[in-house]
């Protein structure tokens, strides 16, 4: 059956720009491209088609395909990271930066967010807040590994997608119970995306009416004097 908006699929992909890989679900490909992150969780991801869990051009490409489809798709800037916007290149006083600014360095600048230092001219620092991939045409090689229909697997996939972690989940009588790993509330990624996970669990996964997050604390063992 052809994939449609709202379907969950397990997806593998590798994205490249000008022949250089910038993103992939394949750990070996990441190592080969020198973009490997040891702490990252590699392997196929679960996405809900139409929800922009991947860039627009790849998301739209999945509609009408079948499980097992493997293909390449060319994605133009308007359906990838957009065109470059000159207004997103800003100048700041060097004194605004706590450390010596260096060309190519990624920095966070207040409400503007994260950008790249593109030049340092005297006492001024030029920061580009465009995505490094803005204005570029991308190529994705992808494979639809399978269509997911089990609500439990759909919800577990959302958690993995946003939190970057596998978590123990049980689903019964409309209640999803998530056992949180120790120390999760110190994880910035979890704190950032927890609300989104809950929202999409209710909105996108059929049959979930209640979500319970279980966090267990243990009394520290006393050391012998």
Language-model segment annotations:
Residues 1-225:
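FKBP-type peptidyl-prolyl cis-trans isomerases
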